[in-house]
Amino acid sequence: MIIYFGIGTNLGDREANLRTALSLLDERVGQQLASSSIYRSAPQGFLSDNEFANIVVAYHTTYSLEDLLLITQKIEQEMGRTQKSVGGVYYDRIIDIDLLQAIHNSSFITHQSTTLTLPHPRMQERDFVMIPLKEVEDILNSK
């Protein structure tokens, strides 16, 4: 399965936060296939003076979607994230790792549970996801 993650940060050394998250994903998820360049954006859905740095990355993995969610939540915790966005209330964050979409045998996987929905239900509304996602898809399609 190929899993696409969206990673964002708007606190501290944002580029270092992205590197750390990528390193931890590399260790725990599987083979990294492609990563976008950094896309900078203003916060969406809340007020903050802190600009976001965002990337999208694709991995080949054998983990289940629910296991991947647990892995990403553990990485967020280890990196110091203390508040999760709940009910449409968003906060500044040192790291945010979202599962965006998954592909198996050239078909998109749809998944709905109490903890995870794929494809990500709001990714189409977010340039900070769609622009780097297109970059990653272009890289993968050129291989």
Give names to the regions the model predicted.
Residues 2, 52-56:
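Short, solvent-exposed beta-strand edge segments and adjacent coil->beta transition regions
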Residues 1-29, 36-43:
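N-terminal beta1-alpha1 ligand-phosphate binding loop
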Residues 13, 44-52, 63-69, 73-143:
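Flexible, gly/pro- and Lys/Arg-enriched active-site loops
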